């Protein structure tokens, strides 16, 4: 979203799926809406983190929860739009980890690629302790859409 969008054409419909974990959500939404003629469709996570609190506790890490879809709705409303909302319930298709190595890899992905060697060791120990059980079978996503003609 930091790139120059001057060459990006405006379109009737714009989709932004799972890409709005940005520092300045209002600016990103402004860019998307500037290229939207009719409708903007967005998927955004429900909840503040991709990693379970118990796993974070096992590695001794506090993660600053990022705003979830409610923040997105509030910004759109402040911008004068009346966003619509629905939910998508999607199975966690990756399934539970079958090895400590896979568990570490999945946790690393959920934390944006950053794990120290000490955290990796604690994760492996946690996995091998047998205490590690998948908490949720589904991931919930907010499906938000804006009709650009529906402003107040």
Question: Language model features by range: what are they?
Answer:
Residues 2-5, 9-27, 44-46:
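A short SAM/SAH-binding and catalytic strip from SAM-dependent methyltransferases
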Residues 49-56, 74, 95-96:
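Short, charged, surface-exposed secondary-structure boundary motifs
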Residues 55-77, 84-152:
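Conserved Class I S-adenosyl-L-methionine
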């Amino acid at each position: 979203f930091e790139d120059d969008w001057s060459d990006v054409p405006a379109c009737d419909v714009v989709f932004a799926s799972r890409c709005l974990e940005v520092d300045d959500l209002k600016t990103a939404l402004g860019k998307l809406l500037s290229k939207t003629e009719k409708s903007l469709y967005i998927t955004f996570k429900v909840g503040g983190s991709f990693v379970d609190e118990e796993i974070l506790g096992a590695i001794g890490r506090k993660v600053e929860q990022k705003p979830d879809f409610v923040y997105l709705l509030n910004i759109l409303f402040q911008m004068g739009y009346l966003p619509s909302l629905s939910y998508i319930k999607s199975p966690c298709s990756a399934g539970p980890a079958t090895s400590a190595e896979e568990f570490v890899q999945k946790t690393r992905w959920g934390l944006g690629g950053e794990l120290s060697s000490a955290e990796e060791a604690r994760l492996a120990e946690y996995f091998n302790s047998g205490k590690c059980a998948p908490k949720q079978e589904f991931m919930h996503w907010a499906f938000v859409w804006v009709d650009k003609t529906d402003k107040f």
